[in-house]
Amino acid sequence: MPGKQSEEGPAEAGASEDSEEEGLGGLTLEELQQGQEAARALEDMMTLSAQTLVRAEVDELYEEVRPLGQGCYGRVLLVTHRQKGTPLALKQLPKPRTSLRGFLYEFCVGLSLGAHSAIVTAYGIGIESAHSYSFLTEPVLHGDLMAFIQPKVGLPQPAVHRCAAQLASALEYIHARGLVYRDLKPENVLVCDPACRRFKLTDFGHTRPRGTLLRLAGPPIPYTAPELCAPPPLPEGLPIQPALDAWALGVLLFCLLTGYFPWDRPLAEADPFYEDFLIWQASGQPRDRPQPWFGLAAAADALLRGLLDPHPRRRSAVIAIREHLGRPWRQREGEAEAVGAVEEEAGQ
């Protein structure tokens, strides 16, 4: 990716509610309980999965065809079952870099979410070999979204609409289960066909239950929500919310529409492009519209300014995308897909 060219109520009731949320690091009690329930369900699944791990060397069971992807923590291979010939994707995590608990966690999160059509289907087979842990998923053979983004151009508008609808549906599904995805970026969106009609989320190693306390571990990137860059409300960190995913989705959609990031870091004092965006966000005046946004239509402006609101409690939820699917998102393109057709492909 190139650079940033690269019923109102009594006042007392509201005050009490704000005080309660402040004591919970910005979460309501209901939100906190939802995350705790998700965490307990994952712990139960991990306990069961640990008891059913297949202990064998991968090459005894599967034949490697070719690599599908490589990351910091492991690799993904296209394999076939030696007896049945079934093609599968195998994610292999080396033991020196992955604990058993870390492996079981990612494996079980994927299992719990794979029923959605825009999320990679994980199969209930975990393998422990001498030097690695592995699990199997459906194979998606056309690479990730990054390879399809043309620098300074992005994707064709119909493909952006389809991608937005499907990713929003997948994220809504994740959030409804008390989880926050936390790693939305082109590299984690797999493309199912050369025409970019179907997309699937993958890689759930960073997914966490809502309310998990999180501190920023490294320098911020464009997808990092600004609340993660601020001092956390609790000593242990920021309780994570679905608003983190809404922010990342807004940044991703900007990239798909323009072919570059809206900014490098969401820090006004360090990034003039982000500072310009904040000025426009506050004023709403056309004269304050930053140059990188000039090619976008009014519907895209409204959508992205909602998803990229710097205040997480005011930020639009990912489902806001549905309101804008039937409109043009670029000024230079007049085509707009019918909302029903796009939503049908969202896999809801």
From Swiss-Prot:
The active site is at residue 183. Keywords: ATP-binding, Kinase, Nucleotide-binding, Serine/threonine-protein kinase, Transferase. PROSITE patterns: PROTEIN_KINASE_ATP, PROTEIN_KINASE_DOM, PROTEIN_KINASE_ST. It catalyses: L-seryl-[protein] + ATP = O-phospho-L-seryl-[protein] + ADP + H(+); L-threonyl-[protein] + ATP = O-phospho-L-threonyl-[protein] + ADP + H(+). InterPro entries: Kinase-like_dom_sf, Prot_kinase_dom, Protein_kinase_ATP_BS, Ser/Thr_kinase_AS. One of its GO terms (molecular function) is ATP binding. ATP binds at residues 68-76, 91. One of its GO terms (biological process) is MAPK cascade. Residues 62-330 form the Protein kinase domain. It is an enzyme of class 2 (transferase). The keyword Nucleotide-binding applies. Residues 1-25 are annotated as: Disordered. Its EC number is 2.7.11.1. It holds the Pfam family Pkinase. Belongs to the protein kinase superfamily. Ser/Thr protein kinase family. STKL subfamily. This is Serine/threonine-protein kinase SBK2. It comes from Homo sapiens. The gene is SBK2.
